[in-house]
Amino acid sequence: MCIRDSLPLVSIPIISFVTDLETAVAAVAIPNLLINVAMAWRSRESRAETRDLSMLGATGVAGGIVGTYALVSFSEAPLVVALIAVVAIYVITFARMPDFRISPAASRRAAPGVGLATGLLQGAIGISGPLIGSWIHCYRLERRAHIFSITTLFALAGAAQLVALLIAGELSGRWTVAVLGCLPALATVPFGEHLRNRFSSEEFDRFVVATIAVAVTALAIRTFA
């Protein structure tokens, strides 16, 4: 996780303080999709080193559509509680076992559920980074493969979310703020790549886990404070 997936984590809580969650999610949907497409394209040469992307992507799209409709129908609190619990377990596991990784066989079995949960969170609350970031991190992929995996999955879930928002009419009257957010979002891509290249593999691991922990804390504060 880095600049590309911190956009909704930072923007949605801030926007939610002055408006409703539906407006916050709609405002961030287009900029978030563009930044992830840009990052995935720039790291596409690492796609052969990834794992489970097809299954995670397909189930993520399905979950994103369902989650977007849940956004206007259900309380977000149960989803946030579940997300916090999963991420807390992972952060504690990493702290106790820094070399923890999941085997290819185990990841294949769990990938459909993880992809579906990621899409549901992306559609329902606009934030799925802590979950999919934790999951991809425990694959321990090479750095650019890690980036390509996460940004591709975010782009797929974000595209499904955007289509569902359009069909549901959630972007009506919100186009201006959504489009205005695109330029500053895309401007962060080179900065994010520069920051990423300054880290060693060990520092990158620690940075990812620290970002996940901070992100889920901010989400909890935004939801329950």
Model-derived regions, located:
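Glycine/small-residue-rich loop that forms an oxyanion/phosphate-binding "nest" at active or ligand-binding sites
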Residues: 48-95
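Interfacial loop-to-transmembrane junctions
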Residues: 190-213
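Transmembrane helix exit motif
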Residues: 37-45, 68, 82-107, 193-194, ...
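Hydrophobic alpha-helical transmembrane segments in multi-pass integral membrane proteins
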Residues: 66-71, 121-127, 161-164, 215-225
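Conserved small/polar residues in nucleotide/adenosyl-binding loops
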Residues: 1-3
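Cytoplasmic-side transmembrane-helix entry/capping segments in multi-pass membrane proteins
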Residues: 49-59, 82-84, 105-115, 145-152, ...
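Small-residue-rich hydrophobic segments that form or flank transmembrane alpha-helices
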Residues: 5-54, 115, 119-122, 129-190
